[in-house]
Swiss-Prot record:
Residues 211-276 form the SEP domain. It comes from Schizosaccharomyces pombe (strain 972 / ATCC 24843). GO terms for molecular function: ubiquitin binding. This is UBX domain-containing protein 3. Pfam families: SEP, UBX. Keywords: Meiosis, Phosphoprotein, Sporulation, Ubl conjugation pathway. Transmembrane segments: none annotated.
């Protein structure tokens, strides 16, 4: 059987037009059974029997026979869509069999809340009673009240746009003054208008302040505001905050608002999910290149072993910046060439040593140790080079003329 025969049989059996029959068959890839089921879903059987013919339709004379036997000049008006009642289709509508297609009719019913009380039945044949299930969690009654109020006062985004100020698209008007007419009366001024959005002015008493927006999330184990922490339902203080919100008052510390400040609270229903703390980006602090690495001091812990660490300098050293006073161990010979070496100390201070080129690295270590005692090493920051406490290497041999050194604690 080709498609034309299937289309003809489908239209004759269901009393529909050829265009309608072709639509249903093409929608189901010319599957006769699926097309019939789809037709029953789109046009239920009770709609055809529930229609009452209007006065105009009742006046149309009934035509019997095939269309080839019709004669006359006037064209027959299109007959209303009719379909024979399918007894099998009514049997499927009883609810025993599942539908193959979901239509808009299935979505017309109101959404039932998952927390509605269930009705139970008890008793015998003649003493049956309908018992309403108790509240599983009476602490969440305030949450249900707030959600119900939020549902009743829901405003669509289109309504918010319509209720917004219409003055943004209007033009502002002002007055101008001709040059050289400062002493004339104000009535001689010429009005000037400018199209486009007006300039934003700070809010005044006549201009209402724009309300803040806060999002209130209700989770399975508590509630939260925006990305803030969770407040459990078991805490009596949190129950008091819910009572404030239910009465239309905003807790200042919870919503982060000031007194008499307008606020819009958006309620999000997440009762089927547990609260998960939002991801926070990494936060920390950096360390300057060449800064001191302080070894942590170990302490005695209960049940643990005591570890003794090397003693480090914990007493702050008062070092004046750019101090050029030499240490007593540095004997400066004014007749020999001298140089200045800047040392950045481990405690954040800085000192400047005046030495001869004949002084050794050991002399520099002793001078720095007198200012900032402890175990340390001296290094050149760039190019990176560590200086050993060597009494045989002079300042000139180490190329430390006008150099900058860094003290690093061990």
């Amino acid at each position: 059987m080709d498609r034309e025969d299937i289309l003809k049989e489908f239209c004759n059996r269901n009393n529909i037009d050829v265009s309608q029959g072709r639509f249903f068959l093409e929608s189901t890839n010319w599957n006769y059974e699926l097309a019939t089921a789809l037709l029953h879903e789109v046009i239920p059987p009770e709609e055809d029997h529930g229609l009452q013919p209007s006065s105009d339709v009742s006046k149309v004379p009934e035509v019997t026979g095939s269309s080839s036997g019709i004669s006359g000049g006037d064209q027959q008006p299109p007959r209303p869509l009719q379909r024979q009642q399918n007894t099998q289709g009514q049997g499927m509508k009883s609810g025993t069999a599942s539908k193959k297609f979901a239509t808009l009719r299935d979505l017309e019913g109101n959404d039932e809340s998952a927390e509605e009380k269930s009705h139970l039945f008890t008793g015998g044949e003649k003493s049956g009673l309908s018992v309403e299930d108790g509240d599983p969690d009476p602490k969440k009654q305030l949450v249900r009240d707030i959600l119900e109020k939020a549902r009743q006062h829901t405003i669509s985004p289109l309504d918010e746009q319509d209720s917004g100020p219409s003055s943004l698209a209007s033009s502002w008007a002002s007055v101008g003054q001709r040059l050289g007419t400062e002493n004339e009366a104000s009535g001689s001024t010429t009005p000037v208008t400018q199209s486009g959005p007006p300039r934003e002015n700070p809010p005044t008493e006549s201009q209402p302040e724009k309300p803040l927006r806060r999002t209130l999330y209700f989770w399975r184990n508590g509630f939260s505001v925006d990305d803030g922490p969770i407040y459990t339902y078991d805490d009596p203080a949190n129950q008091e905050m819910l009572r404030y919100i239910n009465s239309g008052r905003a807790p200042l510390h919870l919503l982060g608002v000031s007194m008499n400040q307008p606020i819009d609270v958006v309620v999000q229903h997440r009762m089927d999910e547990d609260y998960v703390a939002p991801f926070k980006p990494f936060s920390g602090k950096g360390q300057r290149l060449g800064s001191t690495y302080m070894q942590p001091r170990m302490s005695q812990m209960p049940g643990g072993l005591y570890t003794d660490t090397s003693t480090s300098s914990s007493v702050p050293i008062n070092v004046k910046p750019n101090s050029t006073t030499p240490h007593a161990s540095l004997q400066i010979d004014e007749n020999k060439p001298t140089t200045r070496i800047q040392v950045r100390l481990s405690n954040g201070g800085r000192t400047v040593l005046t030495v001869n080129l004949s002084h050794t690295l050991h002399d520099i270590y002793e001078a720095v140790r007198a200012v900032s005692p402890g175990n340390f090493i001296l290094s050149v920051p760039f190019p990176a080079k560590t200086l050993e406490d060597d009494p045989s290497v002079t300042v000139e041999a180490a190329s430390l003329k006008n150099a900058s050194l860094v003290q690093k604690s061990l």
